């Protein structure tokens, strides 16, 4: 999709120019995405004045624009941020239906109270710790059928067993 092409352009240009973009390049890429939804335009002078890192902002822009489209894992691998992003427990909101003292949901039909407020119990539960091994997980294993076709073909580090 066109939005992803603009994001790729911004990221590639940023990398090729030594971690720099001009305002014209930001306008051509990121701000075209923001303009279509009437969002505040990215301004390099504002980012600098606010002490914000352009690389972080470009990556955040990509994460938001492509949310739910299955690109996050490949992005994190390309940026070599696996340890940071995948080496910790998954956290996030967890909503549970509110129950009264009798163990029944007092608002079973709508989930809202008489004032129209959504009722839920806050949960601080976390998922289990995730495991990420930088010596292994940045590469995929070479498939066994390919190794059987060519016995001289080795295996990527960490996947030998």
Residue ranges and their predicted role:
Residues 1-161:
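Acidic/polar-rich alpha-helix caps and helix-coil junctions
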């Amino acid at each position: 999709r066109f939005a992803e092409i603009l994001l790729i352009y911004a990221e590639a240009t940023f990398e090729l120019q030594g971690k720099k973009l001009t305002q014209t390049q930001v306008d051509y890429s990121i701000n075209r995405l923001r303009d279509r939804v009437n969002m505040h335009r990215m301004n390099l002078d504002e980012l600098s004045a606010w002490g914000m890192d352009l690389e972080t902002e470009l990556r955040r822009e990509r994460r938001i624009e492509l949310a739910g489209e299955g690109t996050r894992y490949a992005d994190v691998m390309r940026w070599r941020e696996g340890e940071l992003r995948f080496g910790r427990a998954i956290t996030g909101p967890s909503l549970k239906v509110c129950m009264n003292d009798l163990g029944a949901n007092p608002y079973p039909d709508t989930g809202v109270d008489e004032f129209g407020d959504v009722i839920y119990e806050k949960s601080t539960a976390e998922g289990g710790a995730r495991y990420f091994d930088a010596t292994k997980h940045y590469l995929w294993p070479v498939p066994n059928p390919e190794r059987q076709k060519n016995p001289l073909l080795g295996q990527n580090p960490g996947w030998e067993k």
